[in-house]
Structures are given as C-alpha cells and as structure tokens.
Amino acid sequence: MTNKELVLKFYDEVFNNWDISNLDNYMKDNYIQHNPTAPSGKEGFVEFTKFFFSLKPHMDIIHIGEDGDIVYVFFKCTLENGAINKVCDIYRIEDGKLAEHWDVVEHNVQDIVPVHNNRLF
C-alpha cells in the first residue's frame, strides 16, 4: 500500500465512518501532533475523536498528494450543524503508519462572502 493509499483508507474508515477500532493499523503509538488543540500520541488522538466525532464530521477529499514520506490532504469537512471547514492536513509516514501531523484549518467558510468569483474548493 502506498502512503497515499494508507491516508485515504484512514480517512474513510476513521473520519468518515467514525471507527477507531483499527487505529493500530494506521497510527504509531508515539504519533506527533502539531495542532495546538489536540494532544500527541495515539491515545491523545483517541481522546480528540471523542469530541470530534460528536460533531458528526464528513470529509470530502478535494486533493491528495504524496512526496516520499509526506502526504497532504486538502478537503472539505462538513459537520452535522452545517458548519463547513476548509482543511489541509499534512502527515509524515513512518514504517507504514501515520507518525506526525500538521494542519491548517479555515473554519465556517459557509459564512464567508468572497471578494472574488473563485470557488473555495
């Protein structure tokens, strides 16, 4: 499985099906998290999902790319309450598992009135 395929499978199973039962297949125990609002480690990710899954998120992947051990994912994250977030996640893969994560999030883009005619996604 390529690194990109690993991340696609992770998004489908974990984020879109809200299922962390196979997390050991995707994530290293010492997963490094760079988002300041989420704890590091696999157990930290499990804690994060308790809140995040309560929002009933759905990710629609717009772009995904792979460069060596780095995979980036640009996606639309729609929450049950109607909020739409524009997100770019970046992962470092090590030994076939997610080892490190960075992200950039633009929250509530449904409320933004663009000053241009370009699409947001």
Task: Give the residues covered by each predicted segment.
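C-terminal and inter-domain tail/linker signature
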Residues: 1-121
